[in-house]
Amino acid sequence: MFDPKLKEALGRVQKPGRYTGGEPGSIYKEKDKVDVRFAFCFPDTYEVGMSFLGEKILYELLNSHENWWCERAFMPWLDMKAEMERLQLPLYTMESKDPLTAFDAVGFTLQYELSYTNILAMLDLAGITFYSKDRDDRWPLIVAGGPCACNAEPIADFFDIIQLGEGENQLPSICAEIEKAKKEGISKKQLLLNIAKIPGVYIPAFYDVTYHEDGRVKAITPNEPGIPARITKAIIKDLNQFAPPTNFVVPMVGAIQDRASIEVLRGCVRGCRFCQAGFLYRPMRQRDASLLNKAAQDLCANTGYEELSLSSLSTSDHGQLEELLDDLNEWAPKEHVSLSLPSLRVDNFSQSLIEKTTKVRKSGLTFAAEAGTQRLRNVINKNVTWDEIEKTCTIAFNAGYTSVKLYFMMGLPTETMEDIEGIAETAQKVVDLYYKNTNHAKGRGVQVTISCACFVPKPHTPFQFVPMDTAETLQAKQKHLLESVHSRKIKVNYHDSTTSFLEGVFAKGDRRLAPVIVEAYKRGCYFDGWEECFKYDTWMQTFADMGIDPAFYCQRPIALDEVTPWSHMDYGITHEYLVREYNKALAAQTTPPCNRACNACGANHLLGGPCFDYSQNLV
C-alpha cells in the first residue's frame, strides 16, 4: 500500500513507473528478519540506473545472503523531486518504500563526475547531512565505489567509506563488519577502523591533505595508526569464481539499455593512453565460454529478453569468443534472441565474427577510430590503421550493413586542425567505400555518423599530466569539423565543451572543491550531465564567489614529479610506467597490447604473477 503522499506525487508526475517498484525480478525480504540493510543508490534517473550492469551484479550478490537486504534508489527527475520537496516525502527505496535513513548503509556508484550534485540532491531529499564529520552513530554509513572513486577527492568529505577497485569481495566484507558492529555495539569510528583493514577500502577521514602556497597538493598522510599510506585497489583474480547474474530486475519504464547483458571479460590489453577504464581495470581477465553460455541462456530465460549483449571494454579480445558465439547460436535463434557485441575492435573484426552475430537481426555497427590521422592515433596508442578500417567496413557492407558509427575524440594531446580534418576525411572514405563496393545493399544509401567526444584528461592514465583544451578551443575545433564535412551521408554529433570542462575540473580536483559543489547545489545545480539542466554560468559564478579557479585543476600541465590528489591511491599501474607512456606519446611511439608482450606496467603484482601465459602465443 503506497503512502498517501507518494500516491499524490505519482499522480502529478510523468512516468510514475520510475518510482513505483514492483518490477519482475525485484527481491523482497522481511525487514525485521534481516541484520543488514543496504540501499544501492544510482545518482541519475531510473532509466539510466537500470541500464547499469554493476548494480545488477551487486544486487544479486548481496541479496544472496539470507540476512542482508539490498534495495535500490534512483535520482528523481525534476517533476518528482519538486513533488517530494513540496510534500516533504523523503527519498525511499523501490522495494520497501522506506526512507534512506532507515538503512545501515547507503551506497552510491560514482560513474560520472557530473553526477556529484545529484548525490547531494539525493542525500538532501533523504534528510541526510552532507559531511561525514557531521554524522554520528545514528546515521547510515555513506559509501561510494565505481570508476570515479579513483579520485573522489572533490566529494571525499561527504563519504564515510570509498571503495577502490572491484566490489564483489569488498562490499560483502563491509556488510559483514556492519553486521558484527550492530551485534557488538561498536562505535562508528571503531567500525571504520575495522573496515579500513579490508583490501581496497579508503576512509577519507583517516587522511589529512596539506597544500603548497601555489595550490598544489603537498602531502596526503594517514592520521590514525595502522592506516596505509597508499590504498591498493581490490581485484577479483579469477572471474570464473563469480558467475554473471542470471536474473535481472526488468524495468517497468524502458531503460537506456534494456537488454540482457553478461560481462565476458574485465580489463583491456590495448593500452590506449586516453582510456581511464583500460588502466583502472588492469589486468585483463576473462570468463570461460562454457560459464558464459550457461549464464546467458539462464538470464534470457529468466528475464524474457530477446537481445543479449556481450559486454566488456573489448569483447572481441576474448580468447574464446568464436567458440562462445558458436555455443550461443545453438540456442539463441530458436529463442529469437539476437546477439550484440558493443565493443568491437577494427583490427580483429572478421567475416566469421559478423556472420555469428547477425543470425537473427542486424543492427548498425560502431567502431572507435578515436583520431583522424595515423600520427595522432600513434600518439594515443590506438593501434588502428586505415587499411584495417577499410577491411572492416568492406566486410560489414558485404554483409548488408548500411549504417556505421565512428567514434572520435577532439582535444587530444598534440592535436592540430589537420587532425580534425582527418576525421571528416575518414568518414568520407567510408562513404566512398560503400558505393565502390558492388556487394552493398541495393536500393539503400549509407549513413556514417561521426560521434565526437571532447577529450578529458583523467587520473591514472599517461595523459593525466596534460592540460585540457579550453572550451573556446574545443568549440573552434567543432566548428572546423562541421565545415570539413561535405556529404549528406555523414552526420556529426559532438559533446558540449562546457560540460566537458566541468568534468575535467572534478576528474583532477581535490578536497577544496567540496564546498563549491555544496554551494552550486544550493544554487540549483543538479542533473549537470543533462544539457537541458546544466547551469554553466551558475557554476562559474560559484567558483568565482568562493575564490576557486577551476582552470587550475584541468587546464595546467601537471609536473611529472608532482603530488596529485590521487597519489595515495594505487590501481596497480606504476608512476614510472605512466611517465614512460607519456614520453612515448609525445614521440608518437606505440606500445603493443600487453597480451603479446609484457610492458611492465606493474599490474601483474595484483595477481601475484604474470598476467598472461605468453607460451600460448596470444594474439
Which residues fall in each region the model found?
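Radical SAM enzyme core and accessory elements
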Residues: 1-27, 38-40, 486-619
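A short beta-strand-loop structural module common to alpha/beta enzyme folds
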Residues: 67-79
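N-terminal pre-triad scaffold of radical SAM enzymes
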Residues: 38-44, 62, 248-273, 300, ...
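A glycine-rich phosphate-binding loop feature that marks nucleotide/adenosyl-phosphate handling sites
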Residues: 194-205, 313-318, 342-348, 411, ...
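Canonical Radical SAM [4Fe-4S] cluster-binding loop centered on the CxxxCxxC motif
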Residues: 52, 254-290, 597-618
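N-terminal [4Fe-4S]-dependent radical SAM core
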Residues: 7-39, 46-47, 204, 210, ...
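Glycine-rich beta-alpha loop elements in corrinoid/cobalamin-binding modules
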Residues: 76-222, 459-510, 517-532
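Conserved SAM/AdoMet-binding glycine-rich loop
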Residues: 40-41, 105, 114, 298-405, ...
